[in-house]
């Protein structure tokens, strides 16, 4: 079976992420979306929420599974019997960082390959950071994320006392 793992924080999952997941689902027998716990990044949404949102967003894709993880990515690949890591590149600036990660992963597990995909043009400017900031300030993110993500962000920031919307 040809398996690819698409790791990320997905805080939140965006239309750009979905674009890559959907395209990968046509190239591979199985796509594992691996949601990193990433405590150092202090995610806005909990790991459980991020996993649930991706499950909902990708419900139409039969060969996609979603899992949370807090181990080394190469350990997760071994658990999933996968040898390929999918990463998205929006701009040249992403490449340098991604190349560094790819080389580190290969040093950890020499049989692991990294596959880089670029998003469709209409998704090339979308980032989770931008989506979070727009949502935190009360802006409309409905063209950037799935409706379930809009709802989750609205609920989160309605309860967040540091959000300008609640002040």
Swiss-Prot record:
<comment type="function">
    <text>Reversibly transfers an adenylyl group from ATP to 4'-phosphopantetheine, yielding dephospho-CoA (dPCoA) and pyrophosphate.</text>
</comment>
<keyword id="KW-0460">Magnesium</keyword>
<comment type="subunit">
    <text>Homohexamer.</text>
</comment>
<feature type="binding site">
    <location>
        <position position="17"/>
    </location>
    <ligand>
        <name>ATP</name>
    </ligand>
</feature>
<feature type="binding site">
    <location>
        <begin position="88"/>
        <end position="90"/>
    </location>
    <ligand>
        <name>ATP</name>
    </ligand>
</feature>
<feature type="binding site">
    <location>
        <position position="87"/>
    </location>
    <ligand>
        <name>substrate</name>
    </ligand>
</feature>
<dbReference type="GO" id="GO:0005524">
    <property type="term" value="F:ATP binding"/>
</dbReference>
<dbReference type="GO" id="GO:0005737">
    <property type="term" value="C:cytoplasm"/>
</dbReference>
<comment type="similarity">
    <text>Belongs to the bacterial CoaD family.</text>
</comment>
<dbReference type="InterPro" id="IPR014729">
    <property type="entry name" value="Rossmann-like_a/b/a_fold"/>
</dbReference>
<dbReference type="GO" id="GO:0015937">
    <property type="term" value="P:coenzyme A biosynthetic process"/>
</dbReference>
<feature type="binding site">
    <location>
        <begin position="123"/>
        <end position="129"/>
    </location>
    <ligand>
        <name>ATP</name>
    </ligand>
</feature>
<keyword id="KW-0173">Coenzyme A biosynthesis</keyword>
<dbReference type="InterPro" id="IPR004821">
    <property type="entry name" value="Cyt_trans-like"/>
</dbReference>
<feature type="binding site">
    <location>
        <position position="41"/>
    </location>
    <ligand>
        <name>substrate</name>
    </ligand>
</feature>
<keyword id="KW-0963">Cytoplasm</keyword>
<dbReference type="GO" id="GO:0004595">
    <property type="term" value="F:pantetheine-phosphate adenylyltransferase activity"/>
</dbReference>
<dbReference type="InterPro" id="IPR001980">
    <property type="entry name" value="PPAT"/>
</dbReference>
<feature type="site" description="Transition state stabilizer">
    <location>
        <position position="17"/>
    </location>
</feature>
<feature type="binding site">
    <location>
        <position position="9"/>
    </location>
    <ligand>
        <name>substrate</name>
    </ligand>
</feature>
<keyword id="KW-0547">Nucleotide-binding</keyword>
<feature type="binding site">
    <location>
        <begin position="9"/>
        <end position="10"/>
    </location>
    <ligand>
        <name>ATP</name>
    </ligand>
</feature>
<keyword id="KW-0067">ATP-binding</keyword>
<protein>
    <recommendedName>
        <fullName>Phosphopantetheine adenylyltransferase</fullName>
        <ecNumber>2.7.7.3</ecNumber>
    </recommendedName>
</protein>
<feature type="binding site">
    <location>
        <position position="73"/>
    </location>
    <ligand>
        <name>substrate</name>
    </ligand>
</feature>
<feature type="binding site">
    <location>
        <position position="98"/>
    </location>
    <ligand>
        <name>ATP</name>
    </ligand>
</feature>
<keyword id="KW-0548">Nucleotidyltransferase</keyword>
<comment type="pathway">
    <text>Cofactor biosynthesis; coenzyme A biosynthesis; CoA from (R)-pantothenate: step 4/5.</text>
</comment>
<keyword id="KW-0808">Transferase</keyword>
<dbReference type="Pfam" id="PF01467">
    <property type="entry name" value="CTP_transf_like"/>
</dbReference>
